[in-house]
Swiss-Prot record:
GO terms for biological process: translation. The keyword RNA-binding applies. Part of the ribosomal stalk of the 50S ribosomal subunit. Interacts with L10 and the large rRNA to form the base of the stalk. L10 forms an elongated spine to which L12 dimers bind in a sequential fashion forming a multimeric L10(L12)X complex. GO terms for molecular function: large ribosomal subunit rRNA binding; structural constituent of ribosome. It comes from Histophilus somni (strain 2336). Pfam families: Ribosomal_L11, Ribosomal_L11_N. InterPro entries: Ribosomal_uL11, Ribosomal_uL11_bac-typ, Ribosomal_uL11_C, Ribosomal_uL11_C_sf, Ribosomal_uL11_CS, Ribosomal_uL11_N, Ribosomal_uL11_N_sf. Belongs to the universal ribosomal protein uL11 family. Keywords: Methylation, Ribonucleoprotein, Ribosomal protein, RNA-binding, rRNA-binding. The gene is rplK. Forms part of the ribosomal stalk which helps the ribosome interact with GTP-bound translation factors. It comes from the Bacteria. This is Large ribosomal subunit protein uL11. GO terms for cellular component: cytosolic large ribosomal subunit.
Amino acid sequence: MAKKVQAYVKLQVAAGMANPSPPVGPALGQQGVNIMEFCKAFNARTESLEKGLPIPVVITVYADRSFTFVTKTPPAAVLLKKAAGIKSGSSKPNKDKVGKVTLDQIRQIAETKAADMTGATIETKMKSIEGTARSMGLVVEG
């Protein structure tokens, strides 16, 4: 018989840097989950990724207080900022352009995020990433 699901907890945690402080501690503590067990498992799973990169994670908490979790790919905005070499997007994206990205960089990001995105082809996923880039004030070249 399958375990009874008590809750789903969605968080963004820095790769390799999960610790019991907020946001992890309070979110898991109120569900009765062993926080250190999650932190060790998460850090082990994300040790191959760039340290500090925000990773979305969905934690399934069961009635017996056990848990499983699924890590996703980093948000497109984070990958775009890294590709363009900027700290943050534009506050006025239609007027102020803060950087440039090429179609090759967008294709690479779309391929990285392919598993977490909807869209039949890589081209449709690229269009989605291009839209995110434009809304951040980035110029798409190519």
